[in-house]
Amino acid sequence: MPVGVPKVFYALPDEEEADWIDLYHCLYQERLIVICGDLNDEAVNQIVSVLIYLSTRDDSKEFFIYINSPGGSVTSGIAIYDAMRFNNTPVNTIAVGISASMASFILAGGDIGKRLAFPHSRIMIHQPEGGSEGQSSEIVHEAQEVVRIRRQVARIYAQRTGQPLDTIARDMDRDQFMSAREAKTYGIVDLVAAEK
């Protein structure tokens, strides 16, 4: 049985009295963004909109993006990455649970020194997937586009991790799972959270 979005008692910055607002609105006001589930167009549009809107209001207050996602559309992941990288607001990324596929790309896209993984989180990189049907010329064109995107994603991973491009390309050939510590060694994250 769905429970809906919980409400919390919260005073907005310009308000004297607190009121009940939905949890996500409260988190956004504190610059906390949670990415969970598939990276589909609807979720990505909301995340990009929040990043843009809040960074235009105050670009000095840091974002904290918590990620627990199996990934999704490569273009959606690139859209979030671009929104994170092309504004002046510092961005912390935190892996909670699973950060796979384009979710690991977003995780790596946080500011260097501000990328964290919880100790039991899992991180996975792999090559972008594509599929097409239709006339052979359309299939060839789509395959060329998938190869172009794969190169783009690999270049960005190499840039963000410090790994050689050929290592990234080889590791993306299949699902490459990593523990939090392995992801730190690889350069996807900078820190692994310590347990209490």
Swiss-Prot record:
CC terms in the record's Gene Ontology section: chloroplast stroma; endopeptidase Clp complex
**Mainly localized where?**
plastid
Q: Which CDD domains match?
A: S14_ClpP_2
Q: Which residues form the signal peptide?
A: none
Q: List, from the UniProt record, the residues annotated as the active site of this protein.
A: S101, H126
Q: Which domain of life is it from?
A: Eukaryota
PROSITE patterns given in the database record: CLP_PROTEASE_HIS
| Alphabetic keyword roster | Chloroplast, Hydrolase, Plastid, Protease, Serine protease
- Cell compartment(s), UniProt: Plastid, Chloroplast stroma
EC number(s) for this protein?
A: 3.4.21.92
| Disulfide pattern | none
Its UniProt entry gives the catalysed reaction(s) as: Hydrolysis of proteins to small peptides in the presence of ATP and magnesium. alpha-casein is the usual test substrate. In the absence of ATP, only oligopeptides shorter than five residues are hydrolyzed (such as succinyl-Leu-Tyr-|-NHMec, and Leu-Tyr-Leu-|-Tyr-Trp, in which cleavage of the -Tyr-|-Leu- and -Tyr-|-Trp bonds also occurs)
List this protein's GO terms for biological process.
protein quality control for misfolded or incompletely synthesized proteins
Q: Does the keyword Metal-binding apply?
A: no
Task: Tell me the InterPro entries matching this sequence.
Answer: ClpP (IPR001907), ClpP/crotonase-like_dom_sf (IPR029045), ClpP/TepA (IPR023562), ClpP_His_AS (IPR033135)
Q: Does the keyword Plastid apply?
A: yes
Report the top EC class in one word: hydrolase
Under the subunit heading, UniProt states:
Component of the chloroplastic Clp protease core complex.
Give the similarity note.
Belongs to the peptidase S14 family.
Identify this protein by name: ATP-dependent Clp protease proteolytic subunit
Can you name the source organism?
Answer: Pleurastrum terricola (Filamentous green alga)
Highest lineage ranks of the organism? Eukaryota, Viridiplantae, Chlorophyta, core chlorophytes, Chlorophyceae
